Design a protein with these regions (language model features):
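Classical Sec-dependent N-terminal signal peptides that target proteins to the secretory pathway
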Residues: 1-25
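N-terminal leader/linker segments that initiate helical-solenoid repeat arrays
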Residues: 22-71
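Hydrophobic face of amphipathic alpha-helices that form TPR/SEL1-like repeat modules
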Residues: 66-74, 97-106, 132-141, 166-173, ...
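Terminal, low-structured helical/coil segments at or just beyond the last alpha-helical repeat
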Residues: 178-205
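Hydrophobic/aromatic packing residues within the alpha-helices of TPR/SEL1-like helical repeat arrays
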Residues: 53-54, 85, 121, 152, ...
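Short helix-capping/linker turns of helical repeat alpha-solenoids
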Residues: 45, 57-62, 72, 90-94, ...
Length: 205
């Protein structure tokens, strides 16, 4: 059984992560593909079997922790989700930042904290297309459209489906940037092709 820790310890732990400055993700980029391949071996149509398999390898596999945390979040077990995400983050899995940001954005098991959300996403925007996609909305809200489109393009090029859809909409009218129907159709065609989804690849669903 996964042992839960206190909220105060959680806050301190996350603060340490965020105060550590710009992380060097080079080592993680070397080991994470192998961890992902191992975690993918647990995928099964029998979801209980799949979760049990993740649980068995979670002590040494950050993607197993991430997916167990996501399952806990979907079942509204936010405290467990938070702890598992923190374990995965401590292990160097930067893909969990987006999920932590979601908890803080919605106040799931923690107090809402927009500053923490932005810091979590900014930390990994250059290595995690999902984080880049989510962060783009912050720049859209600030009307910094150049940065927003740059983030969306990075995400879309890496098959983050919602980013492809958003770019298609952006290029279909001149509200944000000049209309480019060719690009709009291009991104919509990629969005409609569901054969390769980056989010599904990372989250397992």
């Amino acid at each position: 059984m996964f042992k839960l820790v206190t909220s105060s310890f959680t806050a301190i732990t996350l603060s340490i992560f965020l105060l550590s400055g710009c992380a060097d993700h080079s080592e993680a980029l070397k080991v994470l593909p192998n961890e992902l391949a191992i975690a993918d071996q647990c995928k099964n149509t029998n979801k209980k079997y799949e979760m049990d398999c993740y649980d068995l390898i979670s002590y040494k596999n950050s993607f197993a922790q991430l997916r167990l945390g996501l399952n806990a979040q979907l079942n509204e077990n936010y405290n467990e989700a938070l702890q598992r995400y923190l374990v995965a983050k401590e292990s160097g899995n930067f893909y969990v930042n987006s999920l932590l940001a979601e908890l803080y954005n919605n106040g799931f098991g923690v107090e809402k904290n927009e500053e923490t959300v932005i810091k979590l996403l900014e930390e990994v925007k250059d290595v995690d297309p999902i984080a880049a996609y989510k962060l783009s909305y912050n720049y859209l809200a600030k009307q910094d459209y150049k940065k927003a489109v740059k983030l969306l393009t990075y995400a879309a090029e890496n098959n983050v489906k919602p980013a492809q859809s958003e770019l298609s909409k952006i290029y279909s009218n001149s509200e944000i940037i000049d209309t480019d129907l060719e690009k709009s159709i291009y991104w919509n065609d990629l969005y409609q092709d569901k054969s390769d989804s980056f989010m599904k690849r990372i989250y397992g669903k």
